[in-house]
Every structure is written in structure tokens, then in C-alpha cells.
Amino acid sequence: MPIQVLPPQLANQIAAGEVVERPASVVKELVENSLDAGATRVDIDIERGGAKLIRIRDNGCGIKKEELALALARHATSKIASLDDLEAIISLGFRGEALASISSVSRLTLTSRTAEQAEAWQAYAEGRDMDVTVKPAAHPVGTTLEVLDLFYNTPARRKFMRTEKTEFNHIDEIIRRIALARFDVTLNLSHNGKLVRQYRAVAKDGQKERRLGAICGTPFLEQALAIEWQHGDLTLRGWVADPNHTTTALTEIQYCYVNGRMMRDRLINHAIRQACEDKLGADQQPAFVLYLEIDPHQVDVNVHPAKHEVRFHQSRLVHDFIYQGVLSVLQQQTETTLPLEEIAPAPRHVPENRIAAGRNHFAVPAEPTAAREPATPRYSGGASGGNGGRQSAGGWPHAQPGYQKQQGEVYRALLQTPATSPAPEPVAPALDGHSQSFGRVLTIVGGDCALLEHAGTIQLLSLPVAERWLRQAQLTPGQSPVCAQPLLIPLRLKVSADEKAALQKAQSLLGELGIEFQSDAQHVTIRAVPLPLRQQNLQILIPELIGYLAQQTTFATVNIAQWIARNVQSEHPQWSMAQAISLLADVERLCPQLVKAPPGGLLQPVDLHSAMNALKHE
């Protein structure tokens, strides 16, 4: 058979094999087009499970007469015009294949009118070349799409359709997912002339709660814990069911959205499951409705033809962010269940970084952050921290008391708490009793030094050196080994016989440092690393560590921890005041001996008296 160009209808039918799996796929594509058109009301009429009729009617902006023929053409879209648009998609649709594919396997009619037009127009495509016919019609502002006799010309596809009830259940599930994504849109679903679902547009929190209960059920609503979590360009909000009360019926409720787009993403599910694993049985699954907002440039939605999957450019960061967000709300729930005498109001608290920060111009938190630090935090996002989430008290129901006030502070503490902490820290003493302090940070000099004032003296502190001592303290085992953080993607490296022998000899010591691995004939697989190494380039650091071990004759955890601390890359090429204050607070807490006896290269006194005297003699 010679090479030839496929007829338009056959090409569209091939594309339909990826986009149009069943009637529910048609409903999803068409309703998403309505939402992209700015519709606030969408009516979905179904007959015989979608096999006979699918009608989608909206009050969106409509389509101009001269664009109707293009709307049914393949690769025609109003969503993108360049590669830059594709790399920052904010609309639900963008491929320009849905209408052409659907019209090739059904009898599709498109009727639309814009606000500028006095009349509506109707378009439909037919024949081998998919020629489009346009004629006048009566229709209000908006668009109606009718899909008749789905798969009428592809009998093999029609045979794979299930029963009418099964196909409608899939459509119902699609509408439920869309209703959870867009609280501001009214959705009406009818089947065989009967109204089955009606989700009215809502704006207030209580109304959103009622829609959540109508879709997910009262049991989920009763156990739902609100999440509002933010760090940088990442925002996580929504609800997760209390794992302690999760039933089999609730485990089917797993809805996740990325920038408003419904997703089935294994990375997100893994992060949520990992956060709940301590409270879920082996046969249980978490129940959640979560919304992840991320910079569109940091996520690729052009992965799957049906747009069910995405690819994150920084998958490890997204995974750990979601894990920490879910874990934090579960820990908040645990704290609220303590006896009343344990949660009585605490005296005014002075956080550990108050001396370094200077005078506090904002409200003091009602409870000590140290009392909220988990024993084994797993998120590593750098020392910057401090990016509290937006307050959810006015946006989402079931917000935990006091959560919004302390969110930014708790998040900073989570980012910085060492993995060796065996128990929550006691409440910090009053400011006057805090003798272990470098002093107050005045400014940053040269990008990597902090100018400090303490007891009337001025000193210059090297922030990279202080960070190295902090990393060494975090990596040095205390009464228990350093907590190992499992890698989402294990690192597999080829090693020599000498390197393998050195690793096996030091395996127990590396385990105390939180580094876990498995070895075979010629390779070693790194499966876990301690918290300070999560954001390091392990493909460079681990081979260098293996080379260092191969050159040693004896091993000690202190020496290995010291080597790692000296060779990890700093996360701050240019330090800010907030980062310096956070670093010093952690160094003062974990390395108090540095305050009493600073090692060489850490502190350098600045002789202000000589400088002042020199100025006086001028």
C-alpha cells in the first residue's frame, strides 16, 4: 500500500480513539469548553446513557458566525497561539481536537450566538471530507452542542460501550468532579428527561460546605479537615478526611485538582498516602478533596490527550509540599483532641528567634511554636521559610482554631527542625533569661555575612560557616539515629569493588546518619537520606561521599557527618535578613556551644571604638 494522506474524517476518528473513550469523555470535553467560554450555567441532557443524545447548553460568550466552521476543524483553538502560551496553560482545553474528533464519530450540531450578533447560527460537519454547513438558528447568547448517535459509524467502538446505567454513572462522576472544581457555576444534569443532579452556584462558605456534602456525602463532611497551605508559588487548599475515622465508603472520595484541572496523579496520591500512613490500615485509602495551585510555567499539562495527567518540573518539591501540608492539618487535629488541661492557654511566648530578629512589631502568637514541632519532619524547603498561607477562616469551613495565625511560623519551624529531635521542645524561656544568643542581626554584608549587635559590641558572622555547623549538628546522631527520609525516586549508582566494600563496612554508621541503601553485584541503590540532604544534588554528592569512604581505613559517624556538612551546597547564594535570623535561631538552639566558644572563622569582632576615635580626630 503506498503512502498517502488520510482523509480528514478518518484522521479525526483516529484522534477520537484517544480523546473519546466513552460518552463521559464527550461530556467532559464539552463542559470544559463551556467553562473556558466563561459560562456560569451549564445544562447537561443525556438520553440512554449518552449513546442516543448528549446535549450541552451554556450561557458563555458564544462563537462568532465566521468562526463556527473553524470550531469544527482539527487543530483549531482560541486558547493558545504560540509555544509560550502552551507552556503556561490556564484554560482547560487547548488541543483543538475535541469537537473535530467528536463530530467524526457522531452526528454533532453546534449552535451559538455572541452578544454582538442579532441572530444565532448553527453548524454541522458531514461527509468524507468533514465539510461544514452553517445556517441561521434561534438561540440565546451562549452555545449548545448536540451529539447524536455516538459511535454510529464505528461499530467496533459501540460494542465496547457498557450498559446505559454504567455509562450514565461515569457521566455523573464527571459532573461531580466538575462541580467540586467550580463552585461558582450552576450545573444541571438530566437523564431521559428527568433532572438527576442540580448544583447551584455558591459563593459563601456555608453554601460551599453544603455542595461538598451533597457530592461527597455527610460522613465525609463530618470528618473533613480543612487545609490552607502555602509556600512560595505553591498553594494547597481543600479538605482531607480524618484518617482515624475513615471508613471503606469514604476511601472512594479522592478528588485532586491542579490549577482547576481534574487530575489522576500518582505523585500527589503518594504524598497524601505517605502523610496518612501512620493512621491508615494496610487496606485503607485516604479520602480527600484537594486543590493545588502552582505557577503554570512549572507544570506541563500537555502529557495525555485526555489531559488526565500532568508533569511537574520540580516533582520532589511538589511531593514534599503536599506531604507537609496534609501532615500539618492531621497534627493540628491530633492536638485538638488532647485533654483540656493540656490545651489550656499558655503564657505569652517569646519565639527562639526573637533576639536575633530584634523588636517584634507584630502580634505575639498565643501558643509556642516549639510545642508544635513534630519529632520527625520530612519537608526540606530551605531556610527561608516564613511564607505563611493565606488565612482560611473566611474561605473554607472547618478551619482549626489558631491555625491561620501560626501557619507561617509553624511552617518555618518545620523547614528548620532537625530530624534528630526526639520530642517536642519545651516552651522557650522569657527574653531576659535567654543567655545563649549571638545577638541581634543588624544587616547583611557582602551577601554572606551578618552584622550582629550584642551587649554593646558589633561582630561579623559568617553565615555559610554557621550553616555548616548547623548541618553537622542536624546530621550527628543523638540518643537515637537521624530519621531517614525515603526518596520518591531511589538513586542507583555503579560502584567499584573497593567502594562497595567501604559502603558495606560503613553501612551501620550511614544508617545512623539517615542514609539507607541496598547493594548488588555492581550497583548501590540509595533509598533514603536525612532531611538536610533532600534538596541536594544527590547524583553529585553521593558519589563523592562514596569516594571519600573508599579512602578511609576507619569510620566514625562524627567524621562522616562533618564531611557531609562541608560538602553540601548552600541553599542561599545571597542571604536575606529573614534567612539569617532563622539560621541563627536554629544554631543557638542546636549548637549552644558555638555561642560560648565560637570556632575560628565564625565570628570576627568589629572595632567600632577605634573607628569612632579616628573620626573624632579628623
UniProtKB/Swiss-Prot annotation:
UniProt KW Zinc keyword: no
> In Gene Ontology terms, what is a biological process of this protein?
mismatch repair
> Where is the region Disordered?
367-402
Q: Which GO terms describe its cellular component?
A: mismatch repair complex
A Gene Ontology molecular function term for this protein is: ATP-dependent DNA damage sensor activity
Skewed-composition ranges (Low complexity): 367-381
The UniProt entry, under PANTHER family, shows: DNA MISMATCH REPAIR PROTEIN MLH, PMS, MUTL, DNA MISMATCH REPAIR PROTEIN MLH1
Q: What is this protein called?
A: DNA mismatch repair protein MutL
